Amino acid sequence: MDSNFHYSIDLNEDQNHHEQPFFYPLGSSSSLHHHHHHHHHQVPSNSSSSSSSISSLSSYLPFLINSQEDQHVAYNNTYHADHLHLSQPLKAKMFVANGGSSACDHMVPKKETRLKLTIRKKDHEDQPHPLHQNPTKPDSDSDKWLMSPKMRLIKKTITNNKQLIDQTNNNNHKESDHYPLNHKTNFDEDHHEDLNFKNVLTRKTTAATTENRYNTINENGYSNNNGVIRVCSDCNTTKTPLWRSGPRGPKSLCNACGIRQRKARRAAMAAAAAAGDQEVAVAPRVQQLPLKKKLQNKKKRSNGGEKYNHSPPMVAKAKKCKIKEEEEKEMEAETVAGDSEISKSTTSSNSSISSNKFCFDDLTIMLSKSSAYQQVFPQDEKEAAVLLMALSYGMVHG
C-alpha cells in the first residue's frame, strides 16, 4: 500500500506569487512524479529555494511514518527562521540497508499516513512582527490570516482598555492644570482653622454658662433653686456659701454668724460648769453655824448638791467620813461637858477651830483617846477616816 505525504510550501519572496501546496509521496522518483500529477499542482521554476528544500526533504526522509491519525507539520518563518512543529507524536520504522548497499528493502505500512509541510517567507526582513504592530492601525491580510477569533477579541479588549487608560490620564492632567498642587494643603489648613474656631466658640460658651451659674448662686444663695431669698437674722446678709441654724429656726443665720454664735454658746456652757464646781467646793466652808443647824444644812447641801457634784467618788467618801467624825466629836463633847448647852457649843467651836490649827499627829492622838469613836468604828475604818481627813485638810487649806 502506497503512503502519501502532504507538504504545503508558502514562499513570499515575490509579491505576485501565492501560497501553493505541494504533495510528495515517499518512495521512488516515479511514484513521486505520479503523485504530483495526480493532485495537479505545479512548482514555480524561478523558486530555487523551494526546489532545494524539497530535494533536501526527499533525501532526508528515507523512512516511512506510521500513525493512527493524520499528522500536520507547520513550517513558519515567524522569527526569520524555519521551525518545524509537530502536532502529534510520530511513529517511524527505519529501513536498514543490507551490507551498506544502495538498494533497500521496501516495507508496506499498515495504514496510509500523510505529512503536511507549510513554508512561508516574509517579503522584507526588516518588517516588524504582526503582533507587535500598532493596535490602532487597521489589520492587514496577514494579521487576519494569523489571528483566530479569540485572538481578535483579546486584541480588541486590549485596545479598548488602552483607550480608557489614555482618556483617564488626560482627564487627570486637565484637573491638575485647573487645581494647583497647593490646593490640597490650602484645604487642610482651612479645615484646621475651622476646627480651631469651633473649639474656641465651645470654650467661650461653656465659660459663659458657668459664670452665669455662679452669679445666680451668689445672688440667691448657694444652690438655691426655689427662688426664695434668705436673710441672715444677725447681719442681714443674703450671700453666703452655707446657711446655719439659729435662734429663729433652721437656716436663719449665715455661715459666719452661725460659727460665731456656736462658739459663744460653748464658752457660756464651760463657764457655767466651772462656776458650779467652785460652788460645790466652797459651800461647806462658808459659815459655821451651831451644831444642830450646821448638821442639817450639811445634809441638805449634800442631798441637793449631788446634781452638781462632779468630783471623783473618793472625795465624796472623804466628805461623808468627815461629817461622821464631827458628829462623834460632838457626842464626845456632850459626854465630857454634859453640864450645859453653852459649854457644848463652846467646845464644838473650839474643837473645829483647833482642828484647823492642829497637826496631823495631834488629830490622831485625840481620836485614839476617844472611847466612843473606838466603839463605833473598827481600826481599819478609823485609819481610812484619818487619811481622808488629812486629804481634805490639805485640799481646803493648801
Swiss-Prot record:
Gene3D superfamilies: Erythroid Transcription Factor GATA-1, subunit A. Induction: Activated by gibberellic acid (GA). Negatively regulated by AP3/PI. Strong accumulation during cold imbibition of nondormant seeds, but not at warm temperatures. Regulated by PIF transcription factors. Induced by cytokinin (e.g. benzyladenine). Repressed by HAN. Inhibited by SOC1. Down-regulated by auxin (2,4D) and auxin response factors (e.g. ARF2 and ARF7). Disruption phenotype: Pale green leaves and reduced chlorophyll levels associated with altered regulation of sugar-sensing genes (e.g. HXK1, HXK2, STP13 and PLT6). Reduced chloroplast size. Faster seed germination. Early flowering. Increased leaves size. Reduced gibberellic acid (GA) levels due to increased GA turnover and associated with reduced expression of GA-anabolizing enzymes (e.g. GA3OX1) but increased expression of GA-catabolizing enzymes (e.g. GA2OX2). Small seeds with deformed seed coats. The double mutant gnc cga1, lacking both GATA22 and GATA21, exhibits reduced sensitivity to cytokinin (e.g. GO terms for molecular function: DNA-binding transcription factor activity; transcription cis-regulatory region binding; zinc ion binding. The keyword Protease does not apply. One of its GO terms (biological process) is glucose mediated signaling pathway. Keywords: Cytokinin signaling pathway, DNA-binding, Gibberellin signaling pathway, Metal-binding, Nucleus, Transcription, Transcription regulation, Zinc, Zinc-finger. Belongs to the type IV zinc-finger family. Class B subfamily. Transcriptional regulator that specifically binds 5'-GATA-3' or 5'-GAT-3' motifs within gene promoters. Involved in the modulation of chloroplast development, growth and division in a cytokinin-dependent manner. Repressor of the gibberellic acid (GA) signaling pathway that represses flowering and modulates greening, in a SOC1-dependent manner. Prevents the accumulation of SOC1 during flowering. Promotes chlorophyll biosynthesis throughout the plant, by regulating chlorophyll biosynthetic genes (e.g. HEMA1 and GUN4) and chloroplast localized glutamate synthase (e.g. GLU1). This is GATA transcription factor 21. It comes from Arabidopsis thaliana (Mouse-ear cress).
